[in-house]
From Swiss-Prot:
Gene: rplC
Sequence segments annotated as region (Disordered): 125-151
Subunit and partners: Part of the 50S ribosomal subunit. Forms a cluster with proteins L14 and L19.
Keyword Signal: no
Protein's name in the database: Large ribosomal subunit protein uL3
GO biological process: translation
Family membership noted in the UniProt record: Belongs to the universal ribosomal protein uL3 family.
InterPro entries tied to this protein: Ribosomal_uL3, Ribosomal_uL3_bac/org-type, Ribosomal_uL3_CS, Transl_B-barrel_sf
Amino acid sequence: MTKGILGRKIGMTQVFAENGELIPVTVIAANPNVVLQKKTTETDGYNAIQLGFEDKREKLTNKPEQGHTAKASTTPKRFIREIRDADVDGLEVGQEVKVDVFATGEIVDVTGISKGKGFQGVIKRHGQSRGPMSHGSRYHRRPGSMGPVAPNRVFKGKKLAGRMGGDQVTIQNLEIVQVDTERNLLLVKGNVPGAKKSLVVVQGAVKVSK
């Protein structure tokens, strides 16, 4: 069974382990989530729970949103996501999910929206190598051959310049260094996708190494 929680990335800091090792960590504020809906194999074809995070003003919501959250006896939520293969039987609609679902040392996957970089060339966007910068070369930071003679067309998937970032990214197998139940904080080893204050999903690792 998978477990998860929604939160907001606060930023990065460092903590000392018991052996004196300095560990870089990302601080995630995961205030209590509310179970808005339960999905089962019988009714929806798969098992999942729908979580809501952070209240939203009713003025900014429509009638379907208000009705959906009213069934869980809660206010409209800003961030709503599903946690697949969750323990559907162990949770009820309207129940709160807190940071104590995770423990120190557990391995998790964190999903967020990567930082937007704007329009970038192929070297920054795809990691291509640049051409010679001297000796008469006129090829420096270009995308490379477009096949103008043969095959006389541009192949699908050709790596070109374009808008970079703003994609959904999941970083797998991150260790939880500390769980602060008083302040609803998770300290995760390493970095996670997104800018400060961006919304993230923390789930139990899918491909944890044994």
